Amino acid sequence: MRAAVIQTVTSVLGWDLARKSQVVKTVDEEAEISCLVGRGKLREEVWQDSASGCIERYNLAFVNHLMYRGDNTRVLGYDVAHGYHHRHFMGETEDINFPGYEELSKRFFREVAALRKKGSI
């Protein structure tokens, strides 16, 4: 009886009590890596829509305080903060065309591999 009353009230009032999708953090990884110049740190964060699985936000960062001291020591990073996709490199920011998260993360890890081999930038 109670369920029928709730359904009647919600339909009469036009309420939508269906579960709304939420943006949920699905990846939260951090790893220390060795570099030609000291130790670095990799950070990967991904937030997805719980209903569709679409990636809503991401953050990829490579930090090494011996390579770069500005921008919280972020040498390289990609994110979608402020509503647009962009790349951070040594304190400079540039807009990027977003090829999809999988392709972007491959690009990021290729760039990090090259940076790790350099003694300085």
Identify the residue ranges that each predicted region occupies.
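Short, compact, well-ordered microdomains
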Residues: 91-121
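The feature represents the first ordered module of a protein
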Residues: 4-84
